[in-house]
Amino acid sequence: MSTSLSVTELQVENFTFPPTVKPPGSTKTLFLGGAGERGLEIQGKFIKFTAIGVYLEDSAVNCLGVKWKGKSAVELTESVEFFRDVVTGDFEKFIRVTMILPLTGQQYSEKVSENCVAIWKSLGIYTDAEAKAIEKFIEVFKDENFPPGSSILFTISGQGSLTIGFSKDSSVPEGGKVVIENKLLANSVLESVIGKNGVSPAAKESLASRLSPLFNDCGADSEKPQS
């Protein structure tokens, strides 16, 4: 049975993330790995800015399950290495960032770009290719505005290309607005959500709690004795 058949939708604030989706620029149907909000503590109050859903290709379960099967949701949540494996895994991923509060494209792209460049420079891996990819990333967001309920859509191919799309409602367009061929940038977009310093601990926890039982189920059929 495919993973897509065994997962459920998730609600974050007033937004529903369906159990499966066909991302922009993709021919595949991905399943909902997890979802959660991104927010900040401001003057003693937790303000939620965006709801984020992370979708994965079915093959991710077997890919990751080889190493992580048998681990509890808590163990996965606390493992930096686990989320790194999700980010770098050779399977398709899709991220939907839905606005709870309004945001301009410029605000969003500048924040993501600053974080990416700072990390790359600290690791000594910031080259001309990354500089050009960041320029393209900022350009596509330049004239965009995102009212509540609108979404930014990121499709990350197994080869590492990043397709960026936008939606003003719950629909998902067939194609993206731009494709950026830079694996480092593609991975960093997901890393910024679920990595070591990811902006959505809730999405990380959700991902771990939903994938843990799927890992334990994977391979169950192949382990049965042949009749």
Curated annotation (Swiss-Prot):
This entry's Gene Ontology molecular function terms read:
chalcone isomerase activity
Query: Which of UniProt's keywords are assigned here?
Result: Flavonoid biosynthesis, Isomerase
PANTHER family, per this entry?
CHALCONE--FLAVANONE ISOMERASE 1-RELATED (PTHR28039:SF8), CHALCONE--FLAVONONE ISOMERASE 1-RELATED (PTHR28039)
Q: What pathway or pathways are given for this protein in its record?
A: Secondary metabolite biosynthesis; flavonoid biosynthesis
Q: What is this protein called?
A: Chalcone--flavanone isomerase
Q: Which Pfam families match?
A: Chalcone
Name the protein family. Belongs to the chalcone isomerase family.
Any one of the GO BP annotations: pigmentation
What's the superkingdom here? Eukaryota
Annotated residues that bind substrate are located at T50, N115, S192
State the protein's purpose.
Answer: Catalyzes the intramolecular cyclization of bicyclic chalcones into tricyclic (S)-flavanones. Responsible for the isomerization of 4,2',4',6'-tetrahydroxychalcone (also termed chalcone) into naringenin.
Biological classification of the source: Eukaryota, Viridiplantae, Streptophyta, Embryophyta, Tracheophyta
Record site feature (Important for catalytic activity), residues? Y108
